[in-house]
């Protein structure tokens, strides 16, 4: 077996070892038996929220076990085919099996990363909020570029994207926009994107000068029914208004848009679908997501530090820099992960940055756990 293929096999084995460690493979079968026994309980659905959580936890374990077994079996089959092909000097069989191993390596690495998304709300859908910061028209244009980037990233993963609210810029781009990203682990991936994003480029608005623009990104989990968030009606103010857009036959011309302000925290959420009733539901769901995240921030120092970086979109709160002039470079200031493929990133190729941030957080948690055991 060629040295390159031996390295690929070793990489897959490493990913499998980490997958087994994350799911605690030694006790997985026992835990699945426990889940199955509880599912058979005739009183299970007396508590619907607990039942739904149990079913999700069970399915998550089943999926993890099936993935591990599938990758392990495919690895074994491919290695055996290569060895057989080499014995029989069948180059075509060897090449096909090697190609399978290369694809399997990518799959194993991806599943290894997904296994790290083990937060309570990591599997949930996400609200993604983008706001233009310092820089006027330049910043509004930059905010629209970020919106396009995230939409393309989400679509490349098979997630669905719904625009909940958008406020157009005075001359170009957007002042703000809120999306709901629907898909498994949507929040788990997007939570690392919260913070200020900085762009350096030559102005496209006729100035010909190098400009620096900022936009703030915030990601919040869509809260499932099993997580209860109480909102005191006395604490909120609900306003209706006419939605503003770029115009055209589909623009919302009724006073159906809804803005909800949570007085104690100052949180403001909006929705501008055609139905006012639907807008109230969407905006209230977004408010509960924000309040839930706020509570997590209070209890979790790491998350708190991350979300404090979402403050004013300016120099002091950057998480990532996108430079288009005088050179091409996108660099994450937390992990130092970087690439010269600026176009690829702006077209939605964000997985490398998200993976680097996730790996950094897991490594930090592991160090903290180790220190706690000392």
UniProtKB/Swiss-Prot annotation:
UniProt modification remark: Methylated by PrmC. Methylation increases the termination efficiency of RF2.
Record's keyword terms, sorted: Cytoplasm, Methylation, Protein biosynthesis
SUPFAM superfamilies found in the cross-reference section: Release factor (SSF75620)
Keyword Mitochondrion: no
GO molecular function, one term: translation release factor activity, codon specific
Role this protein plays: Peptide chain release factor 2 directs the termination of translation in response to the peptide chain termination codons UGA and UAA.
Family the UniProt entry places it in: Belongs to the prokaryotic/mitochondrial release factor family.
Protein name as it appears in the record: Peptide chain release factor 2
Organism encoding this protein: Ruegeria sp. (strain TM1040) (Silicibacter sp.)
Lineage: Bacteria, Pseudomonadati, Pseudomonadota, Alphaproteobacteria, Rhodobacterales
